[in-house]
Amino acid sequence: MAKKIMFQGTSSNVGKSILCTALCRIFYRKGFKTVPFKAQNMALNSYVTKWGDEIGRAQVAQAEAAGIDPIVQMNPVLLKPTGNQSSQVVLMGKPVGVYSAKEYHTKYSLTALDKVKESIDFLDSNFDMMVIEGAGSPAEVNLKANDIVNMRIAKMTQAPVFLIADKIGRASCWERV
């Protein structure tokens, strides 16, 4: 059973991915068999694993930092924006359709949760340390009921959660308060 640590943010672009990448490297150098995990990622560009599965590039960088090959279980749900309020949904590395944001969150995200759980179980049984990255902010109450990437994952994995905030830039969390 892997030890787990989770990072969530006050918003997107606060540094969760780079921090998770750094920690993957640190744990790897300390001798832990480490794996990154992000249940759901949104990105225009993806990476194709040697098994032909699409995953987010951030998880690829994190896998490289951990000294392992990227695998689909690191990022079971990938949303690739296709236009105004819609995305191509990639589940376990394979495209399954294009959904509006509303359709995805109300009809599909909880269906994808089964694959997320399977991925967590696989990683948990094959690694010593799991570095888990949330997405956006856990405080987005409009998404809470169908959340498959933040607090639901924290509860599912029983991982301690660290909140990341950004003080740099025009739209930092401190300027929103």
Q: Which residues does each predicted region cover?
A:
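Flexible phosphate-sensing "switch/lid" loops adjacent to ATP/NTP-binding sites
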Residues: 1-176
